[in-house]
């Protein structure tokens, strides 16, 4: 399954300026906030990545999957890594998750590919 999302970096920047940490804490863990280093483009990329993951799982963000259920980290080469708790991995029958984020022309775009044990 594949999920994709695109976000305006300016829109995220406006939300960060208006709501500050309250906005970030709604969808990012403390370690993810540190990884973003207060960069609007990184914050937008992480937001898009979590939305793309929810779309790949065909549930959206809501009761079955929250923003904070989705964990983002970085590889030694700075590539995004995405995971869910073991409970959510089992619930959605996920074998692996792959992710990519890109930024251009004021937008952040993210793609998530989910491989399930059923495939």
Swiss-Prot record:
The protein's Enzyme Commission number: 2.7.8.7
Gene Ontology molecular functions: holo-[acyl-carrier-protein] synthase activity; magnesium ion binding
Catalytic EC class: transferase
Required cofactor names: Mg(2+)
Gene3D superfamilies attached to this UniProt entry: 4'-phosphopantetheinyl transferase domain
GO cellular component, as recorded: cytoplasm
Catalytic activity: apo-[ACP] + CoA = holo-[ACP] + adenosine 3',5'-bisphosphate + H(+)
Superkingdom in the source lineage: Bacteria
Cellular location(s): Cytoplasm
Gene Ontology biological process terms in this record: fatty acid biosynthetic process
Metal-binding keyword on record: yes
Keywords in alphabetical order: Cytoplasm, Fatty acid biosynthesis, Fatty acid metabolism, Lipid biosynthesis, Lipid metabolism, Magnesium, Metal-binding, Transferase
InterPro entries reported in the protein's UniProt record: 4-PPantetheinyl_Trfase_dom, 4-PPantetheinyl_Trfase_dom_sf, ACPS, Ppantetheine-prot_Trfase_dom
SUPFAM superfamilies: 4'-phosphopantetheinyl transferase
List of residues binding Mg(2+): 5, 51
Signal peptide from the UniProt entry: none
Function summary: Transfers the 4'-phosphopantetheine moiety from coenzyme A to a Ser of acyl-carrier-protein.
Family: Belongs to the P-Pant transferase superfamily. AcpS family.
Designated name of the protein: Holo-[acyl-carrier-protein] synthase
Organism per entry: Helicobacter pylori (strain ATCC 700392 / 26695)
């Amino acid at each position: 399954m594949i999920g994709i999302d695109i976000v305006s970096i300016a829109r995220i920047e406006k939300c960060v300026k208006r709501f500050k940490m309250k906005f970030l804490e709604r969808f990012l863990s403390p370690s993810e906030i540190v990884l973003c280093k207060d960069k609007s483009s990184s914050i937008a990329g992480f937001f898009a990545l979590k939305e793309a993951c929810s779309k790949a799982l065909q549930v959206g963000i809501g009761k079955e999957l929250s923003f904070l259920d989705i964990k983002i980290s970085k590889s030694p080469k700075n590539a995004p890594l995405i995971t869910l708790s073991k409970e959510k991995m089992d619930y959605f029958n996920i074998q692996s998750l792959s992710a990519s984020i890109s930024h251009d022309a004021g937008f952040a775009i993210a793609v998530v590919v989910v491989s399930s044990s059923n495939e």
